[in-house]
């Protein structure tokens, strides 16, 4: 149940500005909770009386503001000639298992399930 709540929280839109966005759109970047604490990429934020805040006594909570989902969203869609593309995330130790993406479906754009890179078939 807790995992489902966390996933649902990730899908929520952030702020009033997001109301003008299309239904599937999401806001990216660091959000701030009502207490002024930065929210992590997983939506983690603690209440004022939460016992888990003890780890931040005497120091500030550090949140990396360069979320990977933001960096992937900045990548343009790659145009390829073939109808099946293999994505390995860059290969080697920095990549992920090789997956094959079929680009002749109705979606017209294929997205890698591991790294989020998008591919589109270039028709000539």
Swiss-Prot record:
GO molecular function, one term: electron transfer activity
Gene Ontology biological-process entries: aerobic respiration; cellular senescence; circulatory system development; DNA damage response, signal transduction by p53 class mediator; fatty acid metabolic process; gene expression; kidney development; mesenchymal stem cell differentiation
Keywords: Acetylation, Disease variant, Electron transport, Membrane, Mitochondrion, Mitochondrion inner membrane, Primary mitochondrial disease, Respiratory chain, Transit peptide, Transport
One annotated Gene Ontology cellular component of this protein: respiratory chain complex I
Residues with N6-acetyllysine modification: 98
Keyword Ribonucleoprotein among UniProt keywords: no
Subcellular compartments: Mitochondrion inner membrane
Gene3D superfamilies from the UniProt entry: q5lls5 like domains
Mode of membrane association: Peripheral membrane protein
Keyword Transit peptide: yes
Transit peptide: 1-28
Family indicated by similarity: Belongs to the complex I NDUFS6 subunit family.
Pathological condition linked to this protein in its record: Mitochondrial complex I deficiency, nuclear type 9: A form of mitochondrial complex I deficiency, the most common biochemical signature of mitochondrial disorders, a group of highly heterogeneous conditions characterized by defective oxidative phosphorylation, which collectively affects 1 in 5-10000 live births. Clinical disorders have variable severity, ranging from lethal neonatal disease to adult-onset neurodegenerative disorders.
Subunit structure and binding partners: Mammalian complex I is composed of 45 different subunits. This is a component of the iron-sulfur (IP) fragment of the enzyme.
Summary of the function given for this chain in its UniProt record: Accessory subunit of the mitochondrial membrane respiratory chain NADH dehydrogenase (Complex I), that is believed not to be involved in catalysis. Complex I functions in the transfer of electrons from NADH to the respiratory chain. The immediate electron acceptor for the enzyme is believed to be ubiquinone.
Protein name: NADH dehydrogenase [ubiquinone] iron-sulfur protein 6, mitochondrial
Lineage: Eukaryota, Metazoa, Chordata, Craniata, Vertebrata
């Amino acid at each position: 149940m807790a995992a489902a709540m966390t996933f649902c929280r990730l899908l929520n839109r952030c702020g009033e500005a997001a109301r003008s966005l299309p239904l599937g759109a999401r806001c990216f970047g660091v959000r701030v909770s009502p207490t002024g604490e930065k929210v992590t990429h997983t939506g983690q934020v603690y209440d004022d009386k939460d016992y888990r805040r003890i780890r931040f006594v005497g120091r500030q909570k550090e949140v990396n503001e360069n979320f990977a989902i933001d960096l992937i969203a900045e990548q343009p869609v790659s145009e390829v000639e073939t109808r099946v593309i293999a994505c390995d995330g860059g290969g080697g130790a920095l990549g992920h298992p090789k997956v094959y993406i079929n680009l002749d479906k109705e979606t017209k754009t294929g997205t890698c399930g591991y790294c989020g890179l998008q591919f589109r078939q270039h028709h000539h």
